[in-house]
Amino acid sequence: MKAVGLVVEYNPFHNGHLYHIKEAKSETRSEVAVAVMSGSFLQRGEPAIVSKWARTKMALASFADVVVELPYIFAVQKAETFAEGAVSILNELGCSSLFFGSEHGDIEAFLNTAAHTIEHEDRLNEEARKQIAFGLSYPQAMAKAFRSVTREGGNIVDLSKPNNILGFHYVKAIMQKQLSMKPETVKRRSSGYHDSTFPEADRIASATSIRKSIFETGSLADSRFYLPKTTVDELDEYARTFGMWHSPEDYFPFLKYSLHTMDTEELKGIYEVEEGLEHRVKKAIRKAGSFKEYMELLKTKRYTWTRLQRMNTHILTKTKKADVKRMLNETHPAYIRLLGMTKKGQAYLAEKKKSLSAPLITKTGSFSHPSLQLDIKAGQVYSAPLKEPVRTMLTEQEYSLSPIRYDEDSRIFLRK
């Protein structure tokens, strides 16, 4: 069976994601869609609106066939590391192609851009270092360096757009690793990634605008038009069971406690706490009464909201620089954690299992690795804002839940 790989967050799964999966299968003529999905916390450092299990169910009910977890060590990272981790896992699972949505929509431009930057990588990095020295943030410095290096590059992708940036890094990772996996793209329909309002006519809205509506209204009334029915059902069920949808503000009391009980030297050892940020963090947390207020006090021209939000998540999970460095030194995936599969997905995995060089994990108790322990810890932190007994129930799912199975013919879940 031929499989297409997708790199996803599904926060939550919406009509644009449904379009993406259908296009991916159709354009690549693949029978199976394999999604590598961020777990409890996402690339921008935010908690997922609902658990990875609920989001897996949304995906399986909407034409994904295999859902595996992108480990925390890759998921809560800058675009380059995020992409490298996801590409490695999809390659390990035997995907013939990687299909991504982008603002540009032309794969030749991505191939040309990636090839040009690989060829001029030393010059690009040197130019970026100069811009950072002038006080620019890492994304701003890279964007300026990139424009300088690619001025003569011809058909080049606009890397000021968020999905173009991720797509560029997928293509670059495939090229640098010399993989046979073929990158392909489709132009995003309607709303942009960061759009915070709903479009007037189209049934496709950004995940950002959907979450904004959900958190502002406390209901799905305004957003259900942009969501598959299965997503609406899962969001409703999650709120009924766990009493909330997760937002960054929910974690502020725990962040405040962590920072008040952590000395400056310990804070300095946390991943992404750089260049004296520990002093700024300590000062901001003393004055702030909310997560938003804290972030406004913390943010500078040099450090973006996203970069600081990731740092805060690493503080919550007590992720140390030394541990990250050691885990990122591994050249191949240490394991692949299966979250869910359809009948067709199960058949595909049975076909590929013998050729896997990394163990396919279905229960966390059957395997031990520092990266997996970090995933479990992230899940425990994720459940912190919940009230008992559902907090313990969600935490226990990290250990007790087997992969979710979905019968795509009868359209029923075989295990709740």
From Swiss-Prot:
GO cellular component: cytoplasm
Reaction catalysis annotation: cytidine(34) in elongator tRNA(Met) + acetate + ATP = N(4)-acetylcytidine(34) in elongator tRNA(Met) + AMP + diphosphate
Database matches in InterPro entries: Rossmann-like_a/b/a_fold, tRNA(Met)_cyd_acetate_ligase
Subcellular location field: Cytoplasm
GO biological process: tRNA modification
Molecular functions per Gene Ontology: ATP binding; ligase activity, forming carbon-nitrogen bonds; tRNA binding
EC number: 6.3.4.-
UniProt xrefs under Pfam families: HIGH_NTase1 (PF05636)
Chain sites annotated for binding ATP: 7-20, 101, 163, 188
Keywords, ordered alphabetically: ATP-binding, Cytoplasm, Ligase, Nucleotide-binding, RNA-binding, tRNA processing, tRNA-binding
Family, per entry: Belongs to the TmcAL family.
Function: Catalyzes the formation of N(4)-acetylcytidine (ac(4)C) at the wobble position of elongator tRNA(Met), using acetate and ATP as substrates. First activates an acetate ion to form acetyladenylate (Ac-AMP) and then transfers the acetyl group to tRNA to form ac(4)C34.
Protein name: tRNA(Met) cytidine acetate ligase
Organism lineage: Bacteria, Bacillati, Bacillota, Bacilli, Bacillales
